[in-house]
């Protein structure tokens, strides 16, 4: 179900297990091995939820007991596109769920002169326009990088309805900015934070995800 009051935002069920995982990764005292382990658990949950939104077609198979089972098969192929570098942390979670999945990368950094996001690099599957795309970035703060990455995908022929944006934490401002540009794209997230601080970090947040995950 879409998370009110945001249309096309799908929040993971706020179970005690999930809240416990977020408590660990938000804690500034958590060491890197634990931060990586528990972040990976959340990422896996996000990927599984993203897969729930892919279209399917009926498929009946025969079991080893010579009985019929009415199931489904996914329609179309998928790929992941990570926003480098933090988004690369989510690639393994996608690979764990989807064997031999194609992965693309987009590098966006802040222009020091304008303070605006700037595209530096992209490497995407040649047939990306024919695939469903999981856009991967752990944090949605202002939405600038995600908006630019999505513009790259659309310019490469990907239809907005085939894009699913997966992240661990969103801000209200980031959601509003992103959906002002792309209202039909589904966002799958695990947490909605209350806002941004003066440095444009999510609050309560967890700091710089990439630094904590890669220990740089």
Swiss-Prot record:
Q: What Gene3D superfamilies is this protein classified in? A: 3.40.50.2020
Binding residues for D-ribose 5-phosphate: 201
Question: Which GO biological process annotations does it have?
Answer: UMP salvage
Q: Per its UniProt entry, what is the enzyme's top EC class, as one word?
A: transferase
| Cofactors (names) | Mg(2+)
Q: Which UniProt keywords apply?
A: Allosteric enzyme, Glycosyltransferase, GTP-binding, Nucleotide-binding, Transferase
- Say which domain of life the source belongs to: Eukaryota
In which residues is 5-phospho-alpha-D-ribose 1-diphosphate bound?
A: 85, 110, 137-145, 208
Enzyme Commission (EC) number: 2.4.2.9
Q: Give the activity regulation note.
A: Allosterically activated by GTP.
Q: What residue stretch is flagged as signal peptide?
A: none
Q: Which residues participate in uracil binding?
A: 202, 207-209
- What does the note accompanying the cofactor annotation read? Binds 1 Mg(2+) ion per subunit. The magnesium is bound as Mg-PRPP.
Which Gene Ontology molecular-function terms are recorded? GTP binding; uracil phosphoribosyltransferase activity
- Pathway connected to this protein: Pyrimidine metabolism; UMP biosynthesis via salvage pathway; UMP from uracil: step 1/1
> What Pfam families does the database record attribute to this sequence?
UPRTase (PF14681)
Binding of GTP: at which residues?
A: 32, 41, 75-78, 102, 131
Recorded catalytic reaction(s): these are: UMP + diphosphate = 5-phospho-alpha-D-ribose 1-diphosphate + uracil
What does the UniProt function comment say about this protein?
Answer: Catalyzes the conversion of uracil and 5-phospho-alpha-D-ribose 1-diphosphate (PRPP) to UMP and diphosphate.
Which family does this protein fall into? Belongs to the UPRTase family.
The UniProt entry, under NCBIfam families, shows: PRK00129.1
Could you identify this protein by its name?
A: Uracil phosphoribosyltransferase
Q: Which gene encodes it?
A: FUR1
């Amino acid at each position: 179900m879409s998370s009110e009051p945001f249309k096309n935002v799908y929040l993971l069920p706020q179970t005690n297990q999930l809240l416990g995982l977020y408590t660990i990764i938000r804690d500034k005292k958590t060491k890197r091995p634990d931060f990586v382990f528990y972040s990976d658990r959340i990422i896996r949950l996000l990927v599984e939820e993203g897969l729930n939104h892919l279209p399917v077609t009926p498929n009946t198979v025969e079991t080893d007991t010579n009985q019929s089972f009415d199931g489904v098969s996914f329609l179309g192929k998928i790929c992941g596109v990570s926003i480098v570098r933090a988004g690369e942390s989510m690639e393994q979670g996608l690979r764990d769920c989807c064997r031999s999945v194609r992965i693309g990368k987009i590098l966006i950094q802040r222009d020091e002169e304008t303070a605006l996001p700037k595209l530096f690099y992209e490497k995407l599957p040649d047939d990306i326009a024919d695939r469903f795309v999981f856009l991967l970035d752990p944090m949605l703060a202002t939405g600038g990088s995600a908006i630019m990455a999505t513009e790259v995908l659309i310019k490469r022929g990907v239809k907005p309805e085939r894009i699913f944006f997966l992240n661990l934490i969103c801000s209200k401002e980031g959601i509003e900015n992103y959906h002002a540009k792309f209202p039909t794209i589904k966002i799958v997230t695990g947490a909605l934070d209350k806002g941004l601080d003066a440095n444009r970090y999510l609050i309560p947040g967890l700091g710089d995800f990439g630094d904590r995950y890669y220990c740089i």
